[in-house]
Amino acid sequence: MEKLEAIVDDIVFQSDDGMFSVLRMESKAQGRFTAVYHGNAPYMGENVAMEGSWIEHARFGRQFDIQSLQVLQPTSVAGIERFLASGAVKGVGPVTAARIVEAFGTDTLEILGTYPERLAQVRGISAKKAAAIGESYSQLSGLRELMVFLEAHGVSSGYAARLQATYGATAITRIKENPYSLAEDITGIGFKTADRIAMAMGMEHDCEARLRAGIAYALTQAAGVGHTCVPEELLVRETARALAVDSAMVQDVFSSLLEQDLLRTEEMGGICLIYPEYLYTAEVQTARRLLKLRDQAKPVTRVNADEVIAKWERDAGITLAEAQRQAIYASLEHGVFVLTGGPGTGKTTVVKGILNVLEQAGCRILLAAPTGRAARRLADSAGHPAATVHRLLEYQPTGDGLCFGKDDSDPLDAEAIIIDEASMLDISLTYHLLKAIPGGCRLIFVGDVDQLPSVGAGSVLKDMIRSGRMPVVRLENVFRQAEVSPIVRNAHKINRGQMPEFLAGADSEFALEEFANEQDAAEFVARTYAQLTSGGDWRRVQVLTPMHKNPCGVQNLNKLLQKYLNPPSANKPEVNIPGNVLRVGDKVMQIRNNYEKDVFNGDIGRVIKIDGKNVTVAFPERPEGDYVTYAQGEVEELQLAYAMSVHKSQGSEYPYVILLMVQSHYIMLQRNLLYTAVTRAKERVLIVGSKNAVRTAVENDKTKRRYSLLAERLQESSEVF
């Protein structure tokens, strides 16, 4: 690698997450040149020592790719003035910088760091302002020291600002004491990064701090794939493997954690299951509260349900199937009720019937769903306002996890609550929902248990049904009007383990296009998407895929689709986001709930304006002109949405779905994933890839059981329904 020393002449670009910078530099050896740096940019006027290599960018030409960077103290009067005038030190602009340097010359930085009170000698600087300038310079010096420390230990200096904000002046001391605390305290730093710092600092690979952090990491990873608990033997073995240490060492630390009540255990079938405290509490309390609610609510007797239902059928011009009628009555009889069924089986009709009776009885009713898109669909289909579960519970963002305004101390004002898309509920959110439900309120879960389970830990809907202790009605009859749909027919065939029937032609209602080469399949998808949306209706088509990586994964597809649909141009503004770039015209997805902006995880919109680092998005569900603007630091809430994972599509419907199914997705080729993807489409499904991949998914009904004891807890003390 080449070593260079240069002055920062200009900061051309800095990403919102502080992890990428484009700099204009000037040095005696190279003259003026462009450099790119994966980290926080130094300030204009600062002198830096760099190591890196020269690269040739296809669009921007020759650049110096900085691998490591150290800020040097400016030594010349001109360099010091330029640094201060850059805005690096709060309260100092070009005029004040010139006055300070005129007064102190090359001693300026020593004055700032050691004798800031002397700044009051400069015209226009009061004693109070001098103290503020000194404090700002001190923080900046601490930040620079922290950046150097991180770089020395192989960690991007882009984390420095977050570390300083969390730990203040003690950041380096805190990290040295226990680098593994970073994984708990700093968003974006996980166990692996903390472990890399610890190893670079010379910590022993079998020290107790590392083993404790490794166990916590293993439990976090397990929760990330849906488990609320893990068998002790598996937990110890996997932790030892990940840390490359002896299992006996992990077992010793694990036993210590149990003695300190930092983990919880449960015996089941001769197996010791280990829980993190928060998931143990959530699971135990969910079971207790479900059983209590089930038995508390009294049957609805304020109206004659038979008469209300009969009148509603006449007015609506429908005749309920017997299972639908039973479902309505069951919801009125029990405090907790579960309604499940596939597409076309009439779940929406049952919900409308339940609402009709409850409204006639004068009940206070609330409707909710796990995502914003699902809530809007519920509101449209039921003709009743609906919210996300988070909004219903008055979610309050905190750095410590889930926090809600509604709980058992201030419960919801409702006599009946209907939760749609209940298969998406994880155990933590269900627990917080149940905490906010008042005694005597009835709770109705509606969802398709055969779809993918929640992204978070637990299988709440499936476990409630599996327990046999909750009243359940499963709708299985597909109604005649739905039966004519190839999508509905094939969805049920897939769910029964049968291959779907593909119709001839890529423009048919249910088609397959086969490709031997995955990149060819991805290119075909991009061309087809471009043709289908050439009229400008970008909302009609959605590309779905099982995985994020490989040629047919979310990341590559989004880049490819963006290239076809929205390529760069000189007059088209753009802004960087992690792993990609956004341009005016791009289809984007909100990836976390933002209640201040009233946008939710999964909302799809279109970029209509980029002004500097501010991005404005139009979301079609909002009134015309009610746009959402994202400032610097908020843009990372967006990602390209031409393609998305099947998991991310849960709770949504699209007129046209293009689904990638290739053999390299084998680890994800499962029946419930294919079933979930197909049921996202209202009008047409085009599967691109291989028939063998489809067959693999159809035949693979061995969905890995999630470690969870919710069903068993519900069975412990209850009468069977």
Predicted feature descriptions by range:
Residues 353, 357, 361-363, 369-381, ...:
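Conserved helicase motor core of SF1/SF2 NTP-dependent helicases
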Residues 496, 603-721:
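C-terminal accessory regions
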Residues 53-58, 591-597, 663-665:
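Short, charged beta-turn/beta-strand-edge "cap" motif at the junction between a beta-strand
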Residues 45-47, 585, 602:
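Loop/turn positions that initiate beta-strands
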Residues 449-597, 608:
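Conserved helicase motor core of P-loop NTPases
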Residues 1-304, 721:
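Accessory, non-ATPase domains that flank or precede helicase/AAA+ motor cores in DNA-metabolism machines
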Residues 337-379, 446, 510-517, 531-550:
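Conserved RecA-like ASCE P-loop NTPase motor core of nucleic-acid helicases/translocases
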Residues 267-342, 349:
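Pre-Walker A segment
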